[in-house]
Amino acid sequence: MINGIINLKKEAGMTSHDAVFKLRKLLQEKKIGHGGTLDPDVVGVLPIAVGKATRVIEYMTEAGKVYEGQVTLGYSTTTEDASGEVVARSSLPAVLTEELVDQTMTTFLGKITQTPPMYSAVKVNGRKLYEYARTGESVERPRREVTISLFERTSPLNFTEDGLCRFSFKVACSKGTYVRTLAVDLGRALWVESHMSFLQRSASAGLTLETAYTLGEIADMVSKQEMSFLLPIEYGVADLPKMVIDDTELTEISFGRRLSLPSQEPLLAAFHGEKVIAILEKRDQEYKPKKVLI
């Protein structure tokens, strides 16, 4: 069995499920999962867990993400991104400066509440929102709280001859953030229709775009029996607090027994030497093995 983490660079036009399906065929391994869905049009880092590493994929999914993208001011779309149909147009504000945009972006920092887009996989009454959208049905969408730790403009404002304005941005956010909704809400705050015209995930769960591999690159390496794209399972717990345990504690964990450890964290990644051997969960004043990986 193959075990480990893959830092996959998902390409546009492919769902996260498509990527997993292709890797299962390529690696001839059924036990593969991904750590955080990317929309088909979004490119970038998609953490993949293989074999035993699938047991820690949930901790990669919970980790924060970093995205780089582009906002277009001047019209909105059905999907809140460039793939949708135009639903409304508006003139740019009489005064639209980089200083105004920057100041407005800072108002989104911290905890904010979002309404998921209709074209999303969020479920309401057992059905995904995009299923309602495709049949023209309206449904009340559940609002969710997310955290934005960074939201900044990374390019000058680019005014076009057809009355639009585009600029690039970078955002660091919590799990569950809809960046296209962030682009739309930014436009509303500037009193103009808007949508997200491009997006890529540049980092997720400690993995970065610079070190990611495309499916084509992985296929080429596999054909040469080269597996260096496969990272150790320890990458899957990079966002969890680390606790190094001794030989006695290792034995206790292997028998599923509780430990008294000097920590108040709700979850710990227990390491013996350089190897992660368990995920420990705080129970009362002790830590109980939640997942034993040895």
UniProtKB/Swiss-Prot annotation:
<dbReference type="Pfam" id="PF01509">
    <property type="entry name" value="TruB_N"/>
</dbReference>
<feature type="active site" description="Nucleophile">
    <location>
        <position position="39"/>
    </location>
</feature>
<dbReference type="GO" id="GO:0003723">
    <property type="term" value="F:RNA binding"/>
</dbReference>
<dbReference type="Pfam" id="PF16198">
    <property type="entry name" value="TruB_C_2"/>
</dbReference>
<dbReference type="GO" id="GO:1990481">
    <property type="term" value="P:mRNA pseudouridine synthesis"/>
</dbReference>
<keyword id="KW-0413">Isomerase</keyword>
<dbReference type="InterPro" id="IPR032819">
    <property type="entry name" value="TruB_C"/>
</dbReference>
<dbReference type="GO" id="GO:0031119">
    <property type="term" value="P:tRNA pseudouridine synthesis"/>
</dbReference>
<dbReference type="InterPro" id="IPR014780">
    <property type="entry name" value="tRNA_psdUridine_synth_TruB"/>
</dbReference>
<dbReference type="GO" id="GO:0160148">
    <property type="term" value="F:tRNA pseudouridine(55) synthase activity"/>
</dbReference>
<keyword id="KW-0819">tRNA processing</keyword>
<comment type="similarity">
    <text>Belongs to the pseudouridine synthase TruB family. Type 1 subfamily.</text>
</comment>
<dbReference type="InterPro" id="IPR020103">
    <property type="entry name" value="PsdUridine_synth_cat_dom_sf"/>
</dbReference>
<dbReference type="InterPro" id="IPR002501">
    <property type="entry name" value="PsdUridine_synth_N"/>
</dbReference>
<comment type="function">
    <text>Responsible for synthesis of pseudouridine from uracil-55 in the psi GC loop of transfer RNAs.</text>
</comment>
<protein>
    <recommendedName>
        <fullName>tRNA pseudouridine synthase B</fullName>
        <ecNumber>5.4.99.25</ecNumber>
    </recommendedName>
</protein>
